[in-house]
């Protein structure tokens, strides 16, 4: 979920902290990517029509591999150096949110069964997406694919978003790419949305700068964290009746959640029982992260390994995989120049004014009605 309604809140109250950028603006930049969020998007969009998805001969879904392969190649071709960060063990405080998600998937599964019995195609499309879950197997297969492509993988001890933010704070990467807005709450200096968008539409990258967010909102980082907790985060319930705008007003007026609780009208607003907002705050301020990771290197692709994994094991088209490998090799040679050219010629800003229509909080829900080009395997 990330932070409920934060994109709209920033668009309304801190528009200068947001700017649209072209994909190519990040040539030579190291970008930490929230892998699980990307895999989830690929499973929903790539090669999916109703309940049909891309599979290999064993009937195992390959949409995540197809999406990860194609999108990573596009990043490399643009001169971007992706670092994929995978989730570790979730914090205990997130168990309640994970239980809610499980319950919603169970409900969606029941609704899907009814839709299939009734032959309701729109409902099938709707509820089949809600049953999607990123599994350990999906993660492990994507790690294997990325390593074969020569792309670095980081395994976070806990939350991937927190690890991405830590890498960015410590100048190990330029920015963080995800769809979850809590990357900002973890303090990522630069945060990118839509970089990993898997739809066929060319959606501009939305870049946020946390320093400008704080400046525009006139808040400290501690106050911004409290604002996010009040708005609604993954770690605890929020106070019913308090949305983003009200939360911002209260934080500006009182300065902290503690002060708000002392002054709030408790007849109007019901405080959750044993509300663990302090622990949620601690998880944002002191997340379980590590900087003790192998040196980030972008190596030549393992050509034989990629053919073995994608073609022989997962039914991808060999000619397309071979051509894709050539793209990876060409992109590596191109990006090896880094951003050297930018030191010798002026760079024109590619940012464009913010368009409110692109401030949706949800991941892209576009449906791939046409067969994905270069798709591996078949549909089931």
Swiss-Prot record:
PTM comment text: Phosphorylated. Phosphorylation upon DNA damage induces relocalization to the nuclear plasma.
UniProt: DNA binding residues: 71, 159, 232, 234
Protein localization: Nucleus, Nucleolus; Nucleus, Nucleoplasm; Mitochondrion
GO molecular function, one term: 5'-3' exonuclease activity
Binding site for Mg(2+) 1: 34, 87, 159, 161
Biological function: Structure-specific nuclease with 5'-flap endonuclease and 5'-3' exonuclease activities involved in DNA replication and repair. During DNA replication, cleaves the 5'-overhanging flap structure that is generated by displacement synthesis when DNA polymerase encounters the 5'-end of a downstream Okazaki fragment. It enters the flap from the 5'-end and then tracks to cleave the flap base, leaving a nick for ligation. Also involved in the long patch base excision repair (LP-BER) pathway, by cleaving within the apurinic/apyrimidinic (AP) site-terminated flap.
PANTHER family assigned: FLAP ENDONUCLEASE 1, FLAP ENDONUCLEASE FAMILY MEMBER
Protein name (database record): Flap endonuclease 1-A
Organism in which the protein naturally occurs: Oryza sativa subsp. japonica
């Amino acid at each position: 979920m990330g932070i409920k309604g934060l994109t709209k809140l920033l668009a309304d109250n801190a528009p200068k902290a947001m700017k649209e950028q072209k994909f190519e603006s990040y040539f030579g930049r190291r970008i930490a990517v929230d892998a699980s969020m990307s895999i989830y998007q690929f499973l929903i969009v790539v090669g999916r029509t109703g309940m049909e998805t891309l599979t290999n001969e064993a009937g195992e879904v390959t949409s995540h591999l197809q999406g990860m392969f194609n999108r990573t190649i596009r990043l490399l071709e643009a001169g971007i150096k992706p670092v994929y960060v995978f989730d570790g063990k979730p914090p205990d405080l997130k168990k309640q949110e994970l239980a809610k998600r499980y319950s919603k998937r169970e409900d969606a599964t029941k609704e899907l069964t009814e839709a299939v019995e009734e032959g309701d195609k729109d409902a099938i499309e709707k509820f089949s997406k809600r049953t999607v879950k990123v599994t350990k197997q999906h993660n492990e297969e994507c790690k294997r694919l990325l390593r074969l492509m020569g792309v670095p993988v980081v395994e976070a001890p806990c939350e991937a978003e927190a690890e991405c933010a830590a890498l960015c704070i410590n100048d190990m990467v330029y920015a963080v790419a995800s769809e979850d807005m809590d990357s900002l709450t973890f303090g990522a200096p630069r945060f990118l949305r839509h970089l990993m968008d898997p739809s066929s539409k060319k959606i501009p990258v939305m870049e946020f700068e946390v320093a400008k967010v704080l400046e525009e909102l006139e808040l400290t980082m501690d106050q911004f964290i409290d604002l996010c907790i009040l708005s609604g985060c993954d770690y605890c319930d929020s106070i019913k009746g308090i949305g983003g705008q009200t939360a911002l007003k209260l934080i500006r007026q009182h300065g902290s959640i503690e002060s708000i609780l002392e002054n709030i009208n408790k007849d109007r607003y019901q405080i959750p029982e044993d509300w663990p907002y302090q622990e949620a705050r601690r998880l944002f301020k002191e997340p379980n992260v590590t900087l003790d990771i192998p040196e980030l290197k972008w190596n030549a692709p393992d050509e034989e390994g990629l053919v073995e994994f994608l073609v022989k094991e997962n039914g991808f088209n060999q000619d397309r995989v071979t051509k894709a490998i050539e793209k990876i090799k060409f992109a590596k040679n191109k990006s090896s120049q880094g951003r050297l050219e930018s030191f010798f010629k002026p760079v024109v800003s590619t940012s464009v004014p913010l368009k409110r229509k692109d401030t949706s909080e949800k991941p892209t829900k576009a449906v791939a009605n046409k067969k994905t080009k270069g798709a591996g395997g078949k549909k089931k």
